[in-house]
């Protein structure tokens, strides 16, 4: 039932004008469950040996090819690392890759880790392009073009992968939520204007797994492009934005792009708000990128920036609109002893105002 259904779905995609499809054979989804001994406990023609376990995947690719013809692109996302107990061994993965190629795939994409895996693969703390060596390891075994993936968020990272011959292409997903113009900006040689994905997963994967609409912490328009249309204004205003954290920065630059004259106020000596604390945490260095992006964006859009300036009624007079984006304060949890001098907030620690000893309890 599933094999003809996959072929029929691919055929409909072709009829709708698509040049190809990707068959999802990784990340612990249905097809991957057939290939891995962890989940395939069958003792019939579809389970047991590695050859039988990969049969379902191979048959899907073969049927899609038969249904869609020789010139249709079939990308197969192959799990190169399951990263779970009783996953596929490397020799089994190589055998799968060869069988998938023989079945008619056009390109092999790299799948890294099941969703159940406890090994981080895409979070902020994972170094950029951390798993591309696994893609390179497969290259001698197949003749198909290979795609590298996971934590490839800037053009220089992608270019290095291609220049070193690690892969023939790179795959981007979350970076295109952060900045839908990523490829155009890369092609134009303007990487500094890219709103870089920081791999926080807060509004993309977290939302999807909660059955909510995917979006992006850094880009409120992600997946809402038809609802949030930033059109040019017919009546420019003088707008003051108070607070140079992520929300204030986004508001100021969007308003300026729409044609308003914008002044951004912040009492701090630098933009970024609480991102300046986040970037100090080991594993969250990518948060530097958001501040880098908005530094460029403020200059590009002509926003007047007044740092080290406390907004007051006096210096806000004369503006047509005032936007408050002053952020939040740490929530204090009341419990016996919470008023003790040794009870401090994360801001106290990350700012360096308080030095924590060797033993600390975090609530």
Predicted regions and their residues:
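Flavin-dependent oxidoreductase catalytic cores
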Residues: 1-242, 246, 250-262, 270, ...
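Beta1-alpha1 glycine-rich phosphate/pyrophosphate-binding loop at the start
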Residues: 108, 241-308
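C-terminal structured "cap/appendage" subdomains that terminate the fold
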Residues: 158-170, 176, 181, 285, ...
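Short hydrophobic core segments
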Residues: 265, 319-327
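Glycine-rich dinucleotide-binding loop and its adjacent helix/turn
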Residues: 220-232, 296-297, 307, 326-363
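Catalytic cores of nucleotide-enabled group-transfer and carboxylate-activating enzymes in metabolic
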Residues: 285-292, 306-317, 321-322, 345-349, ...
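Terminal amphipathic helices with adjacent charged low-complexity linkers/tails
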Residues: 233, 272-275, 325
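Short, contiguous acidic/charged loop-to-helix segments that flank catalytic cores in large enzymes
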Residues: 121-127, 229-231, 236, 277-289, ...
